[in-house]
């Protein structure tokens, strides 16, 4: 599963900033290939408004 940070974390609640960081994303446009697991899905779901997800 490929995730890309599409929106900034500036002004977001700290738990969302921490989740994006835990997913390995730092800057807008950063992409990362992650394993599709329930834990990762939950993290992605909590910040889905900031990410673009490709199967």
UniProtKB/Swiss-Prot annotation:
Biological processes annotated in GO: translation
Q: Which UniProt keywords apply?
A: Ribonucleoprotein, Ribosomal protein
Q: Which PANTHER family match?
A: LARGE RIBOSOMAL SUBUNIT PROTEIN UL30M, MITOCHONDRIAL RIBOSOMAL PROTEIN L30
Q: List the disulfide bonds.
A: none
A single GO molecular-function term is: structural constituent of ribosome
Query: What would be one Pfam family of this protein?
Result: Ribosomal_L30
Gene Ontology cellular-component terms listed:
cytosolic large ribosomal subunit
- The molecule here is called Large ribosomal subunit protein uL30
- Asked whether the keyword Ribonucleoprotein is assigned, the reply is yes
Coiled coil (residue ranges): none
- Does the keyword Oxidoreductase belong to this entry? no
């Amino acid at each position: 599963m490929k995730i890309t940070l599409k929106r900034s974390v500036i002004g977001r609640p700290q738990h969302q900033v921490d989740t994006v960081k835990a997913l390995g994303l730092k800057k807008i446009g950063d992409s990362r290939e992650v394993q599709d697991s329930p834990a990762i899905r939950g993290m992605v779901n909590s910040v889905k408004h900031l990410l673009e997800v490709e199967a």
